[in-house]
Amino acid sequence: MRSLTRRTLTALTATAVVALLGTACTGQSPSGSDGSDSGKDVTITFWHGWSQDNEVKAIKANVAAFEKLHPNIHVNVVGNISDDKSEQALRAGGSDAPDVVSSFTTDNVGKFCSANVWADLNPLLRKDNIDPAATFPAPMLNYSQFHGNQCSLPLLGDAYGLYYNKTAFAAAGITAPPKTFSEFAADAVKLTVPDGAGYKQLGFMPTFHGYETLPAHYLGQYGSTYFGPDGKSNIASDPTVAAMFTWQKDLIAKLGGYDRLERYRSGFGDEFSAKNPFETGQVAMSLDGEWRTAALADDHVSFDWATAPFPVPDDQAATYGRGYQTGTIIGIAKSSSKQTAAWEFVKYLTTNTDAVVSFANAIHNVPSTLAALASPAVIADPAFKTFLDIAKNPNSSTTPASINGGAYQLSIQNFGYDFEAGRATDLQAGLRATAQEIDTAIDQAK
């Protein structure tokens, strides 16, 4: 999966969230066993969002392998389905609704679970003696449930790390990737080559508009929790949040200032193309996901490159190796009358080691079970292994689910835009106001 974080967050609206919460509960309850466990022929419908040729081919291969194991269960696969379309179908219910749905948007798990449109899988996991905590990496398990409701399971993951231009490193006299933020800042400055009012090469683009340099991705290096035990936003009281904003703004100043950086950023090409600024050499270091390794190999860039975990705060140096994680989720429609067959399919895709590994290898994503991460069948060159190690790291984290999706992240991001640009100058006051905004929005969504 490629990262959809920015476009997903910017698409969030309170109206859409309220509409989902207000209408989703009209779906019918499941009718129990569909007879598939006794050999009855059953056809289930699976909606997913993948569209690229290698992705579609990989899905078809996994479905064929499943149908070979379960000859009486047939899977009708429908691809390139957006979250909006699947949400509408699940709200409406009926015979045209899918039985199994996948989503690239882990931010939506909270509303999927709380709106009762995806079935709680806990009873099915218990029935088949599957211990989720012993099966899935902790961050992936965390982003697939909400308040104990395991309404989805991880189906491959994404991990974020550091990409660095080894050729540029050598020219700057840097012999190893940075591990702490102070080392990172020093290297970013060394790697920056000014050119008039712009740059011939920038060490790193730190602004929040810089593709994957979102507040949530930076905060993953701090282990920020976003909410306290009472469910209220803790971004104003958690010192790691203020520390991140202070660090990011300081790095902006060291690299030439916000206006100069934003002018340079305006010349960047599309993130998911060979015009990506890391691929063109416009930036020497980049924060990105595991999928970039395949793109760099396919695009035959003109320099040597490597990957490493993204640096961590100096006072958390022992956590080096951690990273932010997200991924794809899959669940069963609460309204489906074929949940027995649907569960067999979901269980196969998410817990069968061969299925997880083959799918991960085919689309170059991180495997989403502990067994698959440890499998020797995973195709992992040194660059990709970095992301497998990040996924295994006990300090890696994700953004928690919320009843109104990723709206709280959007609030933090919007404040970040104002703070980095100098439109907001009082950090603590801004964080307090943002926390209040988050709490109010969550209360309204309940």
Residue ranges and their predicted role:
Residues R2-K111, A115, K127-P132, F268, ...:
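Conserved N-terminal structural module of periplasmic/extracytoplasmic solute-binding proteins
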Residues N122-F136, D195-P206, S224-M244, D298-H300, ...:
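Short, solvent-exposed loop/beta-turn-alpha elements that line the ligand-binding surface or hinge
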Residues F146-L155, Y160, S182-A242:
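Extracytoplasmic/periplasmic solute-binding protein
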Residues A172, A253-D259, A297-A362:
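Extracytoplasmic/periplasmic substrate-recognition and gating elements
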Residues A188-V189, S233-S266:
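Glycine-centered hinge/linker elements that transmit conformational signals in sensory
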Residues K385-Q436:
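C-terminal capping/gating helix-and-loop segments adjacent to ligand/active sites or protein-protein/ligand interfaces
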